Amino acid sequence: MFSLQDLCRKNLFTPLEPLGKHVVQRLGLYWEGHGSLKRMGHCFVCVDQIHILSINLAIKIAAAEGNEEIVKLLLLWGGNLHYAIIGALESRQYELILIYENQIGDWHDILSLIRDPVIYERCHELNVTCTFQCLFQHAIRHNMVSILQKYREDLANNRRMIQLLYEMACRLQNYDIITWIARNWHVFNIEAIFSIAFIRKDLTLYSLGYMFLLDRMSIEDRNFKSIITRHLEYAAKKGLFDFVLESLKYGGQVDTVLFQAVKYNHRKILAYFIHETPRKTVEKLLLHAVESRASKKTMNLLLSSLNYSIHSIIKKLLYAVVKHKYMLVIKLLLERPKKKINLVDAVLYRLVKHSTNAEIVKFMNEFSVSPERVIKVAARLMRVDLIKNISKDVWENKLERIKHLKQIVYTMKHRNGKNLLMYNIYNITGYTYMNIKEAFNLTKFYAVHNATCLFKEMCKNCFVHDLIQLRELLEDCLHIANKHAYIQIAEAANEYIKYIDDIYISLK
């Protein structure tokens, strides 16, 4: 069976003819003091055949009058119970509120619909377990400045509460409330707004922070320059270009921004300022880019700004490249379409001097550097460990290794380096079987390069081979020594020749 309300909802939207007052009252569609009620669609009602009200306004008025029957009817027609509660609060109709108390999940949900501070506070009081802090927090959430104004004097000395409300307003980006708090209370940490602005990426909030900070400067001694520098560093680090520009309005150094932009590869910021930056600063930025291991695009931007002219900082650049083991700038200079700048040899020298075997091998692979070039430099710098490790890695066969090391000696002019290589070759032969040809070739090699001690050692080793062939070898070595005035080699060769001759005489 249909209820009366269901019949009304179904049939009395647009009756064929006006119903009399008695009929409307019997149907429960008469609102005392207002007239008949008729539903108009889903959101409106018609009162007394004349006035059209929103259904929520109607239910609010009915609740304020304490008219339980009309409230019930309007709820069936789709009215919002929250507006009924608001109306009941306006005229303190608490009995009506008690009827619907169980249908309200959280009284706080109603607060956003209220603009009257008195009603707002009454509604909040329905949450019997809530505190004043909760009231203030919701007031901030709903932009109810009037609530804060009411308790302004009470909170003036509560530093903790003021700070909490200020930061909450900042997080909610409620600019009116933020401004009111900053202007009416003493906020201990006024700078908290900047941290929140960075997190929210809210430039308006950021600008407000500077306005408050400048106001505070008139009554407090603060290091404004230090604050701006800190902001510039962070904004540039995060690539917040608009924040950088905003901070620079109040002072600060562009250099601070540039060094952070290079370090964190924010080319938009870098490109904006680079063309007005002094050359000396750009050179420092390039060195910083190496230290920070900047990206290829960042490095190219700096190099192009210098027009690839780096002669004034070559030593510093090489030092930075080797120290930080970051070779990108060397590669970019080498890849330049015109007027390539080859710093590979210069870097190699410094790497061999200061770096490990693994780092040098990596450099060799990256720039296609031959092992011979590396070994030459290592010999000049007396890096025995590198000579051993690299030659062993490249030429695993010992005879092959000796062959290549001998070729390097032939092409070297550095005397101490040659000697070091020749000693290294001799050390390899100590653990290697050599046939007569290989042994004689190495002996002659030492004679050619005036390595007296090694020549003598090889001569002694060669006595296990045919003495006639050895005497012929010594004659050749003597001829070489006389030709180049290698006195000690000549004396040693003569001595061994006489020794062989004496052996033959004794055998006769």
UniProtKB/Swiss-Prot annotation:
Induction remark: Expressed in the early phase of the viral replicative cycle.
Domain of life assignment: Viruses
Keywords: ANK repeat, Early protein, Repeat
Positions annotated as ANK repeat: 54-83, 253-282, 313-343
A Pfam family recorded for this sequence: DUF249
Coiled-coil ranges per UniProt: none
Function: Plays a role in virus cell tropism, and may be required for efficient virus replication in macrophages.
Family classification: Belongs to the asfivirus MGF 505 family.
Protein name (Swiss-Prot/TrEMBL): Protein MGF 505-9R
Organism listed in the record: African swine fever virus (isolate Pig/Kenya/KEN-50/1950)
